Amino acid sequence: MASKNREIIKLKSTESSEMYWTVKNKRKTSGRLELKKYDRKLRKHVIFKEAK
């Protein structure tokens, strides 16, 4: 289970409706997260942005 310093967030693809769920540390990462991950629908790597 996540501690109180970590927050469960979802990452939404910029090119499709694909989503990932992950955990981020609120103290160390104050801004919004952007990661390049594999999109299964498009079958290629795209940028995923943090969504609330």
Swiss-Prot record:
Belongs to the bacterial ribosomal protein bL33 family. One of its GO terms (cellular component) is cytosolic large ribosomal subunit. Keywords: Ribonucleoprotein, Ribosomal protein. HAMAP family: Ribosomal_bL33. Signal peptide: none annotated. InterPro entries: Ribosomal_bL33, Ribosomal_bL33_CS, Ribosomal_bL33_sf, Ribosomal_zn-bd. One of its GO terms (biological process) is translation. PROSITE patterns: RIBOSOMAL_L33. This is Large ribosomal subunit protein bL33. The lineage of its organism: Bacteria, Pseudomonadati, Chlamydiota, Chlamydiia, Chlamydiales. It comes from Chlamydia trachomatis serovar D (strain ATCC VR-885 / DSM 19411 / UW-3/Cx). GO terms for molecular function: structural constituent of ribosome.
